[in-house]
Amino acid sequence: MGIRKLNKFLQEKCPESITKRSLFQLKNKKLVIDASNMLYRLNVDGELIPMLYQTIITFKYYNIIPLFVFDGTPPEEKKEKLIERRKMRVEAAEQYASLMDDIETKNIAMNDTLRGVIDRLERTKTRLSMKLIHEAKYLLKSCGIPYIDAVNEADELCAFLVNSGVAWACVSEDMDLFAHGCQRIIRYFSVFQQNCVVYELSGILSKLKMKLADFRAMCVVCSNDYEKDGTMTVYDIWHEGLSKNELTIKDVDLFERIVEMFEIKDVGEKSEVDCATFVIEYKECNVELCRFVLEQNGFVFNNQ
């Protein structure tokens, strides 16, 4: 949903609960992966499959056991937001094409500011086609990496699996996981730098002296889904609302619907995952299928 300035707020208020770690420190850990979120980040210049393969190799090198969780059907509250995102992708693609044409035809010199604009447009215009998602699933399956499809949104199920003890943490850049109450979140997972940043929600709540329900309410009130004009930030809520023990709710019905959307108490009933018996573990590899998927994406193998 987008929570304005939440990350900056947490870094300033709770630095001791946010730690940079090497991937070696994740050895033997079981992690749930917000699949769509990671695939978007890996799909740089259309190189999704090579980047995903490199990520799989890294997981296996450190014996990190991942479970990729793919999105299911989004809730009604988010369908309008998805339409907006599709519109933004189209606009970004048009702006990107126009900008690149200007750079080429007008000999515009590249600088850091221009590169930043290009990078932002590239990220915004990126979309995952069903073909790419299916190819990613084929590669995961061939390499023995488990994956499941959530009934609704992946982040909800990811938080449920972490909080149920099935996984140690969730890998995602989606700040919604904090609103879901996910106890441990891994951001900035870097295959090339071999490190990541771990957020501990229990430490964050303790430092802020907040209950999860209050923290979730703060996230919702300053979210893009609730406050569309973009004026409310975490700082506003923290300094003006919570400090005075009062919080102004403009649209109570919308607020309650969004808060309920982030409660994960019934996700186990909607999921095929039985936390009492479910185990995240590597499956058997299918070398021929792996080779086929990679060859379809430009890999060349020496048959000798």
Could you say what each language-model-derived stretch is?
Residues 2-13, 25-150, 157:
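Noncatalytic, basic helical substrate-engagement surface that gates or grips nucleic-acid strands
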Residues 13-27, 31, 62, 193-304:
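Non-catalytic nucleic-acid-binding/docking modules located in mid-to-C-terminal regions
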Residues 77, 179-180, 229:
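Extracytoplasmic/secreted cell-surface and envelope-processing proteins
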Residues 86, 185-192:
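A short alpha->loop->secondary-structure connector
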Residues 142, 146, 164-167, 225:
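Short amphipathic alpha-helical interaction elements and helix-loop-helix interfaces
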Residues 153-157, 193-194:
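A short acidic, often aromatic-flanked loop/helix-cap motif at beta-alpha or helix-coil junctions
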Residues 158-188:
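Acidic, metal-binding active-site segment of PIN/NYN-like and related structure-specific nucleases
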